[in-house]
Amino acid sequence: GTTGRSVLATPMELAADGGAWKNLNFEITKHKQGAIAWKALNQNDRFLMDLEGQMESDGNIEYKVTLIAREDASVQDVALQTHLASGIGRYMMGLGEKGGYWPNDFSWKWNVEKNQDAVWVGDVNAGIQIRLYDNKYERPLNTNFYHQKPLHMPVSWCNGGNGGIDIHNTADGTSINAYSGKRSVKKGDRLYYYFNLAL
């Protein structure tokens, strides 16, 4: 049919210590048939956010987010929070799940041996894939030979094993929380939270 479905119940958010983000600058850097790209500078009380994004007509969206610490601090968490609309979170594939009905509550932690960095959650003709990476990303081998070139663990997302992904049913949809956990930062430290979406 021609009637679309809303995948998200609310806008996705990269939430971090320091409160709400305030936009300082926004610029369209590419606008052509099939693709648009932009960059933005945001800040909160704890971090400066340098963001580059690109969206293509096939539903692929790439975000490269660099957080720069504005002060020495103990950080509770930086997390990509996604809330799917009711009825969208029916099936799941990735993070060790082979594909099928999703298990209602799911928790996953980074582990280089598992060679996993992406999840898809959705319904028939509607869903979202989220892949997490960083500024040193190298495409892993996804065949029987992947042990010869293991996954490059994204340092900011993994955070020494503190990071992971929780997926839960809520009263009005499904929540996906890709978290990185507690860490200490020094003023000027850079954290690279890159992610790719396929809708």
Task: Report the location of each language-model feature.
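Short, solvent-exposed beta-strand/turn "edge" segments of beta-rich domains on protein surfaces
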Residues: L51-D58, Y91, S184-K187
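Glycine-rich (often Gly-Gly/Gly-Pro-rich) flexible segments and glycine-rich loop motifs
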Residues: W110-N115
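Short, hydrophobic/aromatic-enriched beta-strand segments in well-ordered soluble domains
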Residues: W38-N42, L51-G53, L67-A69, L80-T82, ...
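Acidic (Asp/Glu-rich), glycine- and aromatic
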Residues: E56, N60-K109
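A broad, low-specificity signal marking well-ordered, structured residues that form hydrophobic/aromatic
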Residues: I36, V78, V119
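Short, hydrophobic/aromatic-rich segments at coil-to-beta transitions
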Residues: H31-K39, N60-Y63
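Beta-strand-rich recognition/accessory modules
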Residues: T2-N25, K30-H31, N42-Q43, S74, ...
